[in-house]
């Protein structure tokens, strides 16, 4: 089975690398956990985690997981269609559309997801926990909830012009 992902150039960004230890009888076992976001900058983005004894191997595993976990982001011009508020664990993320030219007003993990998704104009606010994995999961969940005006109109059984 052929994958289209190979033809599309995906950009990857390492959001977090954690050193994790497992205490065993002989001492501590060190491993590294990596959180990576990948995207094509054109409406597709995904995230993944990987764990290994070496950092590069953990990053490679995370990139592979992220490529299998891609989502489509509906966009209106250079921004998102509507405001969305999501939470995952203790992390809460608010994403708001912004006028063209205002840029990406987002911090840390939210910025990584938004930029790799290809959204050029957006305002966001992270509330609650600032744990990178939960922030990324909340952001991706918010992007999954976005719907275009045509989709909303079809769900309601009305025309797009009646929507406003």
UniProtKB/Swiss-Prot annotation:
Listed InterPro entries: Ribosomal_Su5_D2-typ_SF, Ribosomal_uS5, Ribosomal_uS5_bac-type, Ribosomal_uS5_C, Ribosomal_uS5_N, Ribosomal_uS5_N_CS, Ribsml_uS5_D2-typ_fold_subgr
UniProt GO MF annotations: rRNA binding; structural constituent of ribosome
GO BP, one annotated term: translation
Keyword Ribonucleoprotein: yes
Domain notes: The N-terminal domain interacts with the head of the 30S subunit; the C-terminal domain interacts with the body and contacts protein S4. The interaction surface between S4 and S5 is involved in control of translational fidelity.
Protein family per UniProt: Belongs to the universal ribosomal protein uS5 family.
Protein name: Small ribosomal subunit protein uS5
